[in-house]
């Protein structure tokens, strides 16, 4: 994943199997008023692995999602569940970072995410089907 060009390349050895326009982290900073908690929305560079894959993933919204929206952080864990925002498929890279779909396909190619890698529907399905659990993911 090239975070400067916002491109995802699926390779097997030296062979390019698929290229997709993606969106990656903004690099922006969010600070929670009064608590001093801070989040930086960068896509983490380095070598990662696909730890899990899910169809119809449900996002367990972290605290920062509520802080960003100016809403109270829910005490009930079920109030954090969002079955819509991640798209039809997700590949889990660990640390809360995923390759997933987007509700905002017009923003693909821009650095607009909170650190995850977003893909369009067709590209996401192709990557999901072609990438096994355990595959290496290089983010640079």
Question: What are these regions, as identified by a protein language model?
Answer:
Residues 3-4, 20-38, 71-80, 121-122:
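N-terminal post-signal-peptidase region of extra-cytosolic proteins
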Residues 12, 19-21, 29-33, 61-62, ...:
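A short, polar/proline- and glycine-enriched secondary-structure boundary/capping micro-motif
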Residues 19-21, 47-49, 136:
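Well-ordered beta-strand positions in beta-sheet-rich domains
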Residues 4-6, 13-16, 22-27, 53-55, ...:
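Solvent-exposed coil/turn segments that connect beta secondary-structure elements
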Residues 42, 58-140:
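Exported/periplasmic cell-wall-interacting domains
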Residues 8, 50, 91:
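Conserved hydrophobic/aromatic pocket- or pore-lining residues that grip, position, or stack substrates
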Residues 30-53, 119:
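Short, surface-exposed secondary-structure junctions/capping segments
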């Amino acid at each position: 994943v090239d975070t400067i060009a916002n491109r995802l390349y699926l390779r097997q050895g030296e062979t390019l199997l698929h290229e997709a326009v993606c969106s990656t982290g903004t690099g922006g900073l969010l600070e929670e008023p009064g608590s001093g908690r801070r989040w930086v929305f960068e896509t983490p560079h380095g070598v990662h692995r696909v730890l899990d894959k899910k169809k119809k993933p449900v996002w367990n919204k972290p605290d920062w999602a509520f802080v960003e929206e100016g809403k109270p952080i829910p005490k009930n864990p079920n109030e954090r569940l969002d079955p819509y925002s991640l798209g039809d498929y997700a590949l889990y890279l660990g640390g809360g970072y995923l390759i997933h779909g987007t509700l905002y396909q017009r923003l693909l190619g821009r650095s607009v995410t909170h650190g995850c890698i977003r893909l369009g529907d067709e590209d996401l399905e192709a990557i999901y089907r072609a990438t096994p659990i355990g595959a290496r993911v290089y983010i640079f």
